[in-house]
């Protein structure tokens, strides 16, 4: 359960942090948008270090599925775009990979 909490914190930090750069560079908003974005990216990196695992690459691989799910939720809630069946199928496939990695290495 603790792993999932840190993955969700990391996902929110990463998505929000990267989105602030999108807002600045793609939507033409103020560069000041990146100030909270950089802080969010620091939270993202810190959260992944709190996952109980000895290999960074394995943590990142398992986190990938949670990140993808969180990105699709962000697409829907923050950007107002409803995910289609292909988005949901992709998320499902990725989460299956996350489960395989988590249950085979984090027991």
Curated annotation (Swiss-Prot):
The keyword Iron-sulfur does not apply. InterPro entries: UPF0060. One of its GO terms (cellular component) is plasma membrane. This is UPF0060 membrane protein Ava_B0196. It is found in: Cell inner membrane. It comes from Trichormus variabilis (strain ATCC 29413 / PCC 7937) (Anabaena variabilis). Disulfide bonds: none annotated. Belongs to the UPF0060 family.
